Amino acid sequence: MRLLDGAPVIGIAVEGDRREQEALAARQAAESLRLLGRANIDLSGQVNVMDDFVGPGYARPTDTMREALGLAARFEGLVLDPVYTGKAFAGFLSLARSGRFDKKQSLLFVHTGGTPGLFGYPEAI
């Protein structure tokens, strides 16, 4: 999916497979656009979700998620949870390290909250 200015949007799944999550994200985006008075916009094929960072399953920690939590906290003062934002940031870091983005390109990581999740998964951090 691309924002109105053409910037790509990449989702990182925390459960399910890529196709399932892409369909869900497309439905939710279409409904959001409808509520904003922008109905009849076809989003099929425009949602890009990666499922490489799900690991052993929903709310199951991964080594890359643990690394992402540590790096975000240490270098940015950013608190991530082990269920959603930790895995999402692990994906974000992986994409950046792989050279997927131009070094001059501005990037945005959308932190969706989840701090209370830290308290439910002390063994994950």
Where is each model-derived feature located?
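Glycine-rich phosphate/pyrophosphate-binding loop at beta-loop-alpha junctions
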Residues: 1-48, 110-125
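Short, intrinsically disordered/low-complexity patches at protein termini
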Residues: 34, 103-104
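Active-site-adjacent helical/loop segments in soluble small-molecule enzymes
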Residues: 43-103
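Conserved beta-strand elements of the Class I
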Residues: 106-108
